[in-house]
Amino acid sequence: MTVVLPTGEITHLGATVSKTSSGYSLLNLMIGSEGTLGIITELTLKIIPAPKATASLIMPFEDLKTALETVPKLKMSSLNPQAIEFMEREIVLASERHTGRSVFPQEMGGQPVGAYLLITLDSDSDDQLYTLLEQAAELVLDAGAMDVLVADSPAKMRDAWASRSAFLEVIME
């Protein structure tokens, strides 16, 4: 990234390696400053191809504590989730009323659900994705999930993430 500073000085930020120094990242500061620290005049982006296979998992838990304790286990695993969200029951219920979509189960085996994790996994093939989904299911069930529900179609994934995306609107009402 090339930036012109308020003094007129031209500076180049970024590197071809993932870690070049400790301390503050001038690159991230510049991006986050929205033009107040300098003007970006040149930017190089690395574009990666879209995944060939994607699915989301809805994982109900009896309580928020167990759901939250599962997040680091997912992040430290080899699954490399594209997204992880945790949600409490009350906001999910309000969101589903707001969107008119009923995606998240309210009880499992007669037990009320207290919290949810919603994750998205992607892969270069359906077979590889299926393996990742099995690994994720095993990990979260061992961690205390009540069940694992697969949103494997674009419509199911859209409904699950639309409920999550509506949280801010629901809170503002």
PLM region spans:
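Noncatalytic alpha-helical scaffold of FAD-dependent oxidoreductases
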Residues: 1-173
